[in-house]
Amino acid sequence: MPFITVGQENSTSIDLYYEDHGAGQPVVLIHGFPLSGHSWERQSAALLDAGYRVITYDRRGFGQSSQPTTGYDYDTFAADLNTVLETLDLQDAVLVGFSMGTGEVARYVSSYGTARIAKVAFLASLEPFLLKTDDNPDGAAPKEFFDGIVAAVKADRYAFYTGFFNDFYNLDENLGTRISEEAVRNSWNTAASGGFFAAAAAPTTWYTDFRADIPRIDVPALILHGTGDRTLPIENTARVFHKALPSAEYVEVEGAPHGLLWTHAEEVNTALLAFLAK
């Protein structure tokens, strides 16, 4: 299987599993918590059919990548992404992040610039700043909320995932119509196969402050979000994000949950392909 080495922990290398398919302009898809690059299958199929080269990779700690106990912060995640881009020598690439993966996109552009990048897309994003503070009243929640998530993951991450996916996909509305029990089970299995340390460390990165990164986005951008998102509510994320980046193309998918890559794949793919074609 293909791997890219991004670091070292004690006697073992830290290797990221990746897939590289198709030809044409490269599109790099960066997954969300607690999934893997395979969560993009409905977008990958559409992009390949449209003539793009599609690269997915599993973030450290998730999927088939190494499961280290170090490097769970967005500076390191962005450095990992930079290593992927440099190793594959990608040029004129499009970065597409989903949920937690949008953080890599923002921090990469801020830290490494856009010499290799043509466009960026933020799907169900966590920008600009989830933490509710005195100087950020639009934040989603106080730090105690995120501490509670970490505690729940440490207590029984497998039970946590079951509840997490209920709201991730809005199963009370979409199970049996827009998503099957089998697809939900696959998400749970993917989550369970990830590292225990990564599962607990990831939520501490969600309240990273990206407000200083956003002004450095100097390529065409797409912000797309579901109005029914219970995981990252649109009023705390995309709508505020768009005000900070008014040049971005902005799309709201009516009624879509956080996990809209699967439940509203047609709407997502239509908007993404239209953005790429411009």
From Swiss-Prot:
Domain of life: Bacteria
Enzyme class, UniProt record, top EC level: oxidoreductase
AB hydrolase-1 domain mapped to chain residues: 26-264
Family matches, as Pfam families: Abhydrolase_1
Full protein name: Non-heme chloroperoxidase
Keyword Lipid metabolism in annotation: no
Signal peptide from the UniProt entry: none
Family: Belongs to the AB hydrolase superfamily. Bacterial non-heme haloperoxidase / perhydrolase family.
Record text on subunit structure and interactions: Homodimer.
Gene encoding the protein: cpo
SUPFAM superfamilies per UniProt: alpha/beta-Hydrolases (SSF53474)
Organism in which the protein naturally occurs: Kitasatospora aureofaciens (Streptomyces aureofaciens)
Active site: 99, 229, 258
Keywords: Chloride, Oxidoreductase, Peroxidase
Gene Ontology MF annotations: chloride peroxidase activity
EC assignment: 1.11.1.-
